[in-house]
């Protein structure tokens, strides 16, 4: 028995288990041993609290194969759970709330699984996967609310799946994007399938300036290429349900080859679907159920081909984004304080988590081993009422 999680982690050999009893642990856990599993016996009552002083709840940097399960991290200055420069990682049944940057954060890391998890109160994003190609990562069955963004993915993609999840009441919803500030641009080949993306208009959410720019949009593909947005329910956004737009940083990044297919998009105040920017080539909208588009006639009646060029793009959305950036840079926006966001409701525990004899599987080839049928993704139950 150890007094701190850190002491137990330091004493554990590769392949071992750290089973954490109920309690509030005022520490930052730094993992330096590969292939260990850190598991709480009660997701809602095993809490790592950063006291608004420590950088992260749990940080796994340069150490492969680590698994974190059934734990809550709150009140860190930066991130709840942070995986950086690793090959093989998994976070299951974890809760991250009221952390100063991201909730669950994977950066420069591949072969990952994040599932059955929850994030709120993050001024950047509840969930983030950045700077990886191919990422070989899946985010499945998560809830992200009251964040700057529900999901952000800068310069990531390649077998990157975001499925069967709920993104609601954030400032902006899901934002695959390209920036010059990270390696491996552009963002590409992300699969956003079977999610419920709802009411991301939350002006009271915490947010940085870049997140404020996304306010009122469900899915924003900003300078991304060859993404597939399919079979989602996207409703009640004050600007766009889905918008495909160029991104501008040090360089100008057009959006190419994105497929927006078979989504149900409802009650968007400006337009359900939009295409904006210059030289956006080969973007395809087909089979979607919607009412309005910007510009009109954005959806083709048949199969999309190479003849779908920038003729359908509208520059007014781009100018609107530029105007909002100017507004933000003048400091003319108010957001919520991540330190005082609401405490989330109790979340589902991992089955049999309090058993020391539960199987231990280090995060090795976790993406390939993850048993999910990507051709038959189920929507969250919250979306069902919109399908009838």
Language-model features, listed with the residues they occupy:
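Solvent-exposed coil/turn segments that connect beta secondary-structure elements
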Residues: 23, 34, 41-43, 53, ...
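Extracellular beta-rich repeat passengers
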Residues: 53, 93, 194, 207-214, ...
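Right-handed parallel beta-helix/beta-spiral solenoid domain characteristic of secreted/periplasmic
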Residues: 1-3, 17, 22, 35-77
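Acidic, glycine- and Ser/Thr-rich low-complexity intrinsically disordered tracts
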Residues: 253, 268-388
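Right-handed parallel beta-helix
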Residues: 39-45, 64-75, 87-102, 110-125, ...
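Short glycine/acidic-rich loop motifs that flank beta-strands on beta-rich extracellular proteins
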Residues: 25-31, 49-56, 77-83, 100-107, ...
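Right-handed parallel beta-helix/beta-solenoid
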Residues: 1-7, 11
């Amino acid at each position: 028995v150890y007094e701190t999680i850190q002491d137990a982690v330091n004493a554990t050999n590769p392949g071992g288990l750290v089973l954490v009893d109920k309690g509030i642990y005022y520490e930052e856990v730094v993992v330096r041993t590969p292939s260990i599993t850190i598991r709480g016996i009660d997701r809602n009552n095993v809490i790592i609290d950063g006291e608004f002083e420590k950088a992260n709840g749990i940080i796994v940097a340069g150490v492969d194969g680590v698994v974190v399960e059934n734990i809550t991290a709150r009140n860190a200055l930066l991130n709840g759970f942070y995986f950086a420069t690793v090959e093989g990682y998994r976070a299951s049944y974890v809760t991250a709330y009221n952390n100063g940057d991201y909730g669950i954060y994977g950066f420069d890391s591949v072969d990952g699984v994040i599932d059955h998890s929850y994030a709120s109160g993050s001024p950047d994003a509840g969930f983030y996967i950045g700077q990886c190609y191919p990422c070989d990562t899946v985010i499945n069955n998560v809830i992200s609310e009251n964040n700057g963004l529900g999901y952000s993915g800068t310069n990531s993609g390649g077998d990157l799946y975001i499925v069967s999840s709920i993104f609601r009441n954030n400032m902006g919803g899901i934002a695959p994007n390209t920036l010059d500030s990270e390696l491996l641009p552009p963002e590409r080949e992300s699969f956003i399938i079977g999610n419920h993306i709802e009411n991301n208009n939350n002006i009271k959410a915490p947010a940085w300036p870049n997140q404020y720019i996304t306010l009122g949009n469900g899915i924003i593909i900003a300078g991304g290429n060859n993404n597939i947005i399919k079979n989602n329910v996207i409703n009640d956004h004050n600007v766009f349900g889905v918008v495909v737009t160029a991104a501008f940083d040090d360089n100008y990044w057009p959006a190419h080859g994105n497929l927006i297919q078979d989504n149900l998009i409802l009650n968007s105040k400006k337009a359900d679907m939009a295409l904006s920017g210059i030289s956006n080539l080969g973007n395809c909208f087909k089979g979607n159920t919607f009412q309005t588009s910007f510009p009109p006639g954005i959806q083709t009646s048949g199969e999309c081909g190479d003849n779908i060029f920038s003729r359908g793009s509208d520059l007014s959305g781009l100018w609107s984004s530029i105007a909002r950036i100017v507004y933000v840079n003048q400091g003319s926006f108010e957001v919520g304080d991540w330190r005082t966001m609401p405490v989330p409701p109790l979340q589902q525990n991992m089955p049999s988590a309090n058993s020391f004899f539960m199987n231990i599987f280090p995060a090795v080839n976790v993406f390939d081993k993850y048993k999910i049928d990507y051709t038959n993704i189920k929507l969250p139950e919250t979306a069902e009422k919109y399908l009838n």
